[in-house]
Amino acid sequence: MSVVSLPQLLEAGVHFGHKASRWNPKMRPYIFAERNGIHIIDLVQTARYLNEAYEYVREGAEKGWRFLFVGTKRQAAGIIAHEATRCGSYYVNQRWLGGMLTNWATIKTRIDRLKEIEEMQSSGLLDRLPKQEAARLKRELAKLEKYLGGIKTMRKLPDAVIIVDQRREANAVQECIKLKIPIISLLDTNCDPDLSDVFIPSNDDAIRAIKLIVGKLADAIYEGRHGQLDTVEEDEYDYEGAMDMDLEDDILEDVEDEEEGDPEQGE
């Protein structure tokens, strides 16, 4: 059974790629067509690869794998934090700090510092310090929480990393490759499939597309750990509306209606 329908993918705008002039030729097998200078992703391929990614992630979660979600672009940051938290995973949704994985020992000292200041705050010690010192520590705490809050409970390197926007997160990709940590990623038409162990051809710029794909991967982790999905959890967006249409014609019509491509799609 497919974890997502073609109408759901279409409604979320998963099919909108980048300008054809910016494509990576390695993505040719996953491109359906070009219209008005924009590449259109083959949603049949997306559904197939999402099914494979779902099973890969679910089976990993069953084995006790710990996952790290990475997505620092504005459109992805909130989704990454929400979905990672929902399925009990770690996340980086601000700036990727150099050496976050390859220099884990040093990053761990900064996490320890974050926890130290948090303890000072919860114990009331900060309130008893001189105002200037307390203000300095609160600023330090805010900065550490911003960049490391999503991984402060991570005791060791993750077993797999889920990445939104391979090109933007190039440093994270290279660190994973160096450490042989499996990469699961959304691949837009300007990406390189050779840099991912598991990938899903998808628009990686539109909020609804990111929400749909990342949400399904979070579902897979949750299902792998708990044996079933929690039906109380509902997506923020409604992707379930049934549409009676010829998908091929509709995809092309959507693109022809766009003068500059999907308004949510980056250049």
UniProtKB/Swiss-Prot annotation:
Keyword annotations for this protein, in alphabetical order, are: Ribonucleoprotein, Ribosomal protein
GO molecular function terms attached to this record: structural constituent of ribosome
Region spans: Disordered: 247-267
- Give one Pfam family: Ribosomal_S2
InterPro entries per the UniProt record, alphabetical: Ribosomal_uS2, Ribosomal_uS2_bac/mit/plastid, Ribosomal_uS2_CS, Ribosomal_uS2_flav_dom_sf
Is Ribosomal protein included in the keywords of this UniProt record? yes
Q: Tell me where on the tree of life, at the top rank, the source sits.
A: Bacteria
Cellular component terms per the entry's GO annotation? cytosolic small ribosomal subunit
The family database entries (Gene3D superfamilies) matched by this protein are listed as: Glucose-6-phosphate isomerase like protein, domain 1, Helix hairpin bin
Query: What's a GO biological-process term for it?
Result: translation
In the record, the note on similarity to other proteins reads: Belongs to the universal ribosomal protein uS2 family.
Name this polypeptide is given: Small ribosomal subunit protein uS2
**Provenance organism:** Synechococcus sp. (strain JA-3-3Ab) (Cyanobacteria bacterium Yellowstone A-Prime)
Q: What is the lineage of its organism?
A: Bacteria, Bacillati, Cyanobacteriota, Cyanophyceae, Synechococcales
